[in-house]
Amino acid sequence: MLKAVLKKSREGGKGSKKEAGGDFGSETPALSSSGDSPVNSLSTTEDTYRVSLAKGVSMSLPSSPLLPRQSLLTQSRSNKKSPGPVRKPKYVESPRVPGDPVMIPFGEGSKPSEPSATEAKADNEPSCSPAAQELLTRLGFLLGEGIPSATHITIEDKNEAMCTALSQGISPCSTLTSSTASPSTDSPCSTLNSCVSKTAASKSPCETISSPSSTLESKDSGIIATITSSSENDDRSGSSLEWNRDGSLRLGVQKGVLHDRRADNCSPVAEEETTGSAESVLPKAEPSAGDGPVPYPQSSGSLIMPRPNSVAATSSTKLEDLSYLDGQRNAPLRTSIRLPWHNTAGGRAPEVKARFAPYKPQEILLKPLLFEVPSITTDSVFVGRDWLFHQIEENLRNTELAENRGAVVVGSVGFGKTAIISKLVALSCHGSRMRQIASSSPSLSPKSSDPTQDLPGTPLLSPSSSTSALSVTRTPAGPGTADSQRPREDAVKYLASKVVAYHYCQADNTYTCLVPEFVHSIAALLCRSHQLAAYRDLLIKEPQLQSMLSLRSCVQDPVAAFKRGVLEPLTSLRNEQKIPEEEYIILIDGLNEAEFHKPDYGDTLSSFITKIIPKFPTWLKLIVTVRANFQEIISALPFVKLSLDDFPDNKDIHSDLHAYVQHRVHSSQDILSNISLNGKADAALISKVSSHLVLRSLGSYLYLKLTLDLFQRGHLVIKSASYKVVPVSLSELYLLQCNMKFMTQSAFDRALPILNVALASLHPMTDEQIFQAINAGHIQGEQGWEDFQQRMEALSCFLIKRRDKTRMFCHPSFREWLVWRADGESTAFLCEPRNGHALLAFMFSRQESKLNRQQTMELGHHILKAHIFKGLSKKTGVSSSHLQALWIGYSTEGLSAALASLRNLYTPNVKVSRLLILGGANVNYRTEVLNNAPILCVQSHLGHEEVVTLLLEFGACLDGMSENGMNALCYAAAAGHMKLVCLLIKKGARVDHLDKKGQCALVHSALRGHSDILQYLLNCEWSAGPPQPGTLRKSQALQQALTAAASMGHSSVVQSLLGMAEEHEIEVNGTDTLWGETALTAAAGRGKVEICELLLERGAAVSRANRRGVPPLFCAARQGHWQVVRLLLDRGCDVNLSDKQGRTPLMVASCEGHLSTVEFLLSKGAALSSLDKEGLSALSWACLKGHRAVVQYLVEEGAEIDQTDKNGRTPLDLAAFYGDAETVLYLVEKGAVIEHVDHSGMRPLDRAIGCRNTAVVVTLLRKGAKLGNAAWAMATSKPDILIILLQKLVEEGNVMYKKGKMKEAAQRYQYALRKFPREGLGEDMRPFNELRVSLYLNLSRCRRKTNDFGLAEEFASKALELKPKSYEAFYARARAKRNSRQFLAALADLQEAVKLCPNNQEIKRLLARVEEECKQLQRNQQQKQQGPPPAPANDSDNEEDAPASSLKDHFPIEEAEEEDTSSQEESISPTPRSQPPPSVPSPYIRNLQEGLQSKGRSASPQSRAGISKSLRETVAQSGLVMQPTKQAQIVKTNQHLGSGQSSMRNSSTKIQVSSQNPPPSPMPGRVSAAPAVSRNQHLEGTGPFTAGTGCGHFGDRLGASQSLQLQRSESGTAYPLPSKVKAAERLLAHASVAVDMAPPNQGGPVSCSDVRHPASLSSSGSSGSPSSSIKMSSSTSSLTSSSSVSDGFKVQGPDSRIRDKGTTQVQGGTAEHRPRNTPFMGIMDKTARFQQQSNPPNRSWHCPVAEGLLTNTATAAGLQSNSEKPTLKPGGYCSQAKPCSVPPLSMGVHNGAQVKELEENKCQIPALCQDNRITKGVPHLYPEGVSKQPLHVSTEAHRSHLTSAKPKRSFIESNV
């Protein structure tokens, strides 16, 4: 039989299993087949899948929720087709199913996939980021696409390979399916067998849709559970895969494998706290091999707790497997409260889309179990019980009551206990959880739902919960009037408002009955309680708390996990008043159910609560329910007991039952008609029937519910007044229901195997799993799927399908009725669970893939329970135990791993463990805990005597050691297990064995204070003679034990050891060979005052030092134990005793920062002034270690503050070295010398910089520390320090600026600029650039104050290059330009500033002034057309600016302007830019625009107005920006505008307009359209020129103006030089014509305007297209200047101006210029610094490009023909002017460098330089040097004749 079952039925048995390579569930196309069932080539139909189920293909039984579900075997083994749709297998071991997508999209069957191909791919595919995965997953749900399941791994590799929780990288925390998440079959959290059908038809009840939330909701799968590679059976019934509301299965996200090596340091150490098993809370996570993030590692170990009937053994899933829990968590009640929106058939629900929460991973990794109570449905009504809630409330509020820690509701089966709990949950903050898992009530099939949980459950879900509009209605039968009921009804709401967590125990779902899951789930629910939001926040902030609550930690030490992870944090939060001062309640239902799974070792839920309740804070209460016949399990709880059993006596119970019957009768016409004899039901009849039913019920709501259900469905009709037809008990009700369902015995026999399997299973099973189990018992003639479905349908009223597609018994009482009957009751329909165990065992045995640890434990459990070989031993001669061992050995290869699984270690199942060992498990197998200790060591540590005996019986090695060298005896001695120590010694364990720390068992017992074990070990035989390696003599061990006991404060052990001193050669002053301590130094260092006193009394020497030479006094002082110090001083120690380094106890205490010890020592006369061998005092040591309180105390006590050591270091030096700024500040304030230099030349500041102590650097600088060369040298490559030092320089400059010392301020700024680091700091350069901007602005203000307007403008432009959006820089530059009379350019800058900071009033004020000045200029120009206007007074502004203080605020521009003797000082601070910058030009600007209209008119004075108008309009249209280059602007300061230039300016405007259409570029100097218009209007339309302007000057000006245009062009791209040259050549021809035609102007000389007009005509033609326009990039890289600005130019410009002096009006008020020889900020040219200090009265603004072109023209034509007085040398003039037409200009050039560079770079071009080649090369030769060369002009000569344009200025100051 065994052979047949194991071999034949498995078709290939082990062989095929091995061939599969251990990929459980791997879908290999070629399966070995047995002869009778030919292999069907990968048939993907549902039928074949069913067949494979029938054949026993690999499918895991429902197992621990810990484990992911096992995937279904894929190929069917026979050709038979099973009609049912198939559910796809959920992979047990691995989170990812190799072949198919885990989920079948809602309602769609997943497409068949080629398993082997997919399988190979699955493991190798890299996963995308969790966020992306989550998104894809969600899209998949929305679009109905399947999502690939997680990778799978071979099972046996599971020992170390554990799956982690993120399959596919999906975030485990997503709240995809609201908060109730249960793992998908694929998820490690799910315990269901994975059996998602490959082609599940949409109607298939089995099809699953996975939604990524199982583990999505909690990362626990990671923390707690690394799933062993074996998929533990996912079916933990409670965990049932979590289904979406639409019935879709949630995908568990487990992915990746990780070898989790737990760091369990349980080995004892000489520490105060013994390390508990909880230490190994967080295993080290190794990167998972799979794709996808690996949250927390878990190690594998089976962890299921045994129950009396070995259930726990079967649950031994590996701890890692605990991820199963994840699936369970988050679930609401264990009630299936079926709400209408839940489709039990698993179809697609309409609200799927609405439920997708925004993707945001949760940080909480804990997940509550998913509870479903099948009996609570939407048609359940909850009536009454107000009296009960009222009593509970009163008792819990009664503070005087000793039993007010909680309440126990006691009642018999079916009395409504679960419904009471569910009612409270439904009204609590977790009510939504309950509603989420509710499903619609299964049609009207007679459902024996538990009233206990159900009846009282209508509004159970709260009124909104169900379609059956059953609300909490009170019938007249209810007790009391409405008034009296009011407070009672309030009681339930009050209690519900206090509920923060809940738990349901269900016997048929093992995991709900285990303590670790209880702790983890309660913690997860507490996090989700809105009253305890602070607790959630705390867990997020402190991940170690979450790891303490991980399932792994809960398995290892549930008491410590609950205490440290829940109770202590809650208490501390309450003390901090972060939790409201209220009482809170935890609900626990059905404690008696948990007793069914009582482990061999460890607590049941009731014993755990009894143990932990004393640690509960008084404000945290429990309400628990228990059956009346199990009251003894809660007898020790300090709870008030409320009984539901005193039925006849308690009128409230009577009233509740009546109210329920009345409610049901009145709400159903069917019941009314069936209880009336004549079809009429009057009140009296109803009352009579009600009384009869209530009397029969004996208080059971379940009885009433089931009976009224029969009336409602017409199965019972009252025929006589005797009511004989009404069943009298629950047993009769169940018998009646079964008789109605199974009319014949054969009908019941067909259903019997299904019931047997359901009774035997540890978890709820899906239909596929049950189908597989049923067929596992057949070798031939398997049951068909359709036939099976019919049988399941017949049982659907007894086996309720839950939302996760698993089946649970309708009520615990029905389950019990099927197995057991009271005496005298009918035995019909009794079931035999043993047969169910056999079928489940066969199912596991026939599974093709390897069994994981969890499944192996379950297989052992079922084999033992089935006991199929009973009675065969006599026939076969082989004992049944050996046959069972043979069975399990043939069925799985993971026996050793299962034996060492985590749960089987901490809550071992002894019987299953014995079976595993008999089957061949290795008793010396290494575990994953206690440093990979062998099983014997772990069991010795845990004190499991029975298991240790079992292991020793089978030959476990006594000398087996963990990685730290401890053997079983050491662990037993350290843990204090006396019996195990005796057992191990008797079996031959070595007493003198040393671990890797050199400690023997004797020392371990002494460290932990186990004197009885120490005595026992001393009496054992120790090896005589010289100790062997790894051993030691007894005397050495005793000396070590004395030191160990003294250090830990175990006085009883010390006394007993000292009592044996003579007998065993123990010396009280001896040093041990292990730590080198004496007993007194060890005790003193640990602060054990009592032990010190004891040792001193026994003769310990006060001055005896340890092996390192440290006396007891120093040990105590170093650790701050002043009480021990006092004791030792009292016993004669010298307070100023010094050690080998000359240090005193005071120095040691100061060094460690123990203030109380320092105070005590000083009070005892310790010397403050004593120095050690290095010259350090106590104060020096305190400063060196940064103990501010000690420093302060010592200084106050008179310590010398400037005491130097042998290296010349003072305490301040040492404090600066350490880096505590407050200590440094304190010392400085107390008079420490801040500039003290030690022997190495270092000052405190240098030390702080060297150590990068920025806070100290800042403090010292504030206190006046000087910056020397050493400081700058130390700051090299330390950007954070360097920026502080530079800011210090800026602050010094700012102080001088405010004092009016402009020169000194500029020097500081300049010095700071020299100290800037070179490029290369990357991101660190940002703050430096900000600071550089600040410095440039400060320098700009300084130069403006000293009337160096050109430099002021230049520095502002530099600031703009670094920070193009700086409104302060625009403002500063506008101020400089305005001072140099460049009103239009100033206007443009101000408009940019207004754009950037529209609300700044100061900018607006200045803008208004400049606009007014422009209008005035326009009026002056018009007047000048008739004659030279009088020179206006110099309008220079005096400003008081506060320099920029830091790189963050370039100090508000505090620029005060004095206009006409009234000075204003206002700061421009950044203001919100809410208003857009003004885009409408001012009236003045509009007037200017009108002048741009006529483009080709004659330039005679009469037509100037029209030309200017046309120019203005053109400019306005093109949005050009006219801002002169820096050189041009500076030159303009000294130039006066001639009246005859406007026409030529107009023509040049046209050129500029065409060239300025490109989009604005972000360069600092550019301005956008609106400001551009106004600027152009100033430039072009204004500025009358005096009649006598010389053409030479005009040419100069044109060169400058061209450079201006070139630089200011908007496009930012430089056109090639040849086009410029050509344009210039074209202009030459026109120029000569213009000279000839020009009519003489007033005063004789030819007006420049006359010359300009023809050029304008010609240039206008060429300027129409961008290609011919002359436009240059303004970037600094294209900076060029005319190479022709030579010395000759410098001479002739002034020459001509001087000659014209008679016709020119000289502007007065020129400031005195003091040329410099030294460069200023790299600017060598004096012209740049001086030239702008006098402001010419009238200036005409013109288009730079055109004027530049005209310059060439005029030059070529020979301006000598002009009737101007001076005769210019053609060559000289050409060399000056011509190059100006070509080179591009940029704003970023330093003025000072221009002349110098030009001269060095062959700037001087021969006299008649008309060859364009030279000019072509210039831009490339001089990119920077030439851009800013102002026309060299004398401030005294012909100011009114000078054009405002300036050629590249390389000379200026020489003529000033």
Swiss-Prot record:
SUPFAM superfamilies: Ankyrin repeat, TPR-like
UniProt feature, compositional bias: Low complexity: 60-77, 439-475, 1417-1426, 1656-1686
PROSITE patterns tied to this protein: ANK_REP_REGION, ANK_REPEAT, TPR, TPR_REGION
ANK repeats: from-to residues: 893-925, 931-960, 964-993, 997-1026, 1037-1066, 1075-1104, 1108-1137, 1141-1170, 1174-1203, 1207-1236, 1240-1269
Bias (Basic and acidic residues): 8-21
Residues found modified as Phosphoserine: S60, S63, S64, S204, S267, S462, S1436, S1463, S1665, S1673, S1674
Residues bearing the modification N-acetylmethionine: M1
Protein location: Postsynaptic density
GO CC field: axon terminus; dendrite; neuronal cell body; postsynaptic density
Bias (Acidic residues): 1454-1463
Any one Gene Ontology BP term: visual learning
Secretion signal span: none
Region of interest called Disordered, as start-end residue ranges on this chain: 1-45, 58-130, 203-222, 262-296, 437-489, 1417-1597, 1636-1720, 1832-1856
TPR repeat start and end residues: 1286-1319, 1333-1366, 1368-1400
Assembly mode: Interacts probably directly with DLG1, DLG4, HOMER1. Interacts with DLGAP1, INA, CAMK2A, GRIN2B and GRIA1. Interacts with TNIK and MINK1.
Family (UniProt): Belongs to the TANC family.
Function summary: May be a scaffold component in the postsynaptic density.
Protein name: Protein TANC1
Native source species: Mus musculus
